[in-house]
């Protein structure tokens, strides 16, 4: 079990280090095969915070604080409304809807179609709102931000820095909430220590590839991960 989990964390950390997203996308369903989700989810939150802290420090010169704050503030404001959506609408319907949009967008991007938004700072408001709605309803805060940055053909380091900053702040909030509710316990911390070397191995190799990979290859990898994310969301709705 530990060997399998070790390999999963290496792979997931590698993906995260390269693209700045996709860690939970890979790790959650695979680790869920051999471990309880009560262990897996807090573990992934802790590891995500650690990874994003390291990546963010390395990419700090590419962070646009004003844009990030707009994105975060809009997301926080909309999260309670997302929770209301979860109460009002079936969760599976929301997952299906999000999955279809993400898959369709990935296909469109792959075909080379995009609509460039000139005022990006202003556009971060609706993007943040959509992210907050999805975060509060189905815990999928990433797709709106990833889709927007992909549409804008953001330079890979700007893409990674923006996404990492956004997730880093969400990670901090989530760790506090999980700790308060007793979800981060001795068992979770013990498993975190055992798997920590795997995280570092995967992350370091991923970050090296992320620095060397060509912009076009980076965009293609992002689109593939988006397609996988959307597909898993659709499958998870049934």
Predicted regions located by residue number:
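Glycine/small-residue-rich loop that forms an oxyanion/phosphate-binding "nest" at active or ligand-binding sites
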Residues: 63-110
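Small-residue-mediated transmembrane helix hinge/kink sites in multi-pass secondary transporters
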Residues: 83-87, 147, 207
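Interfacial loop-to-transmembrane junctions
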Residues: 204-225
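Small-residue-rich hydrophobic segments that form or flank transmembrane alpha-helices
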Residues: 3-69, 142-199
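Membrane-interface helix termini and inter-helical loops of multi-pass transporters
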Residues: 83-93, 178-191, 235-238
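Small-residue-enriched transmembrane helix starts and helix-helix packing motifs
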Residues: 1-15, 119-133
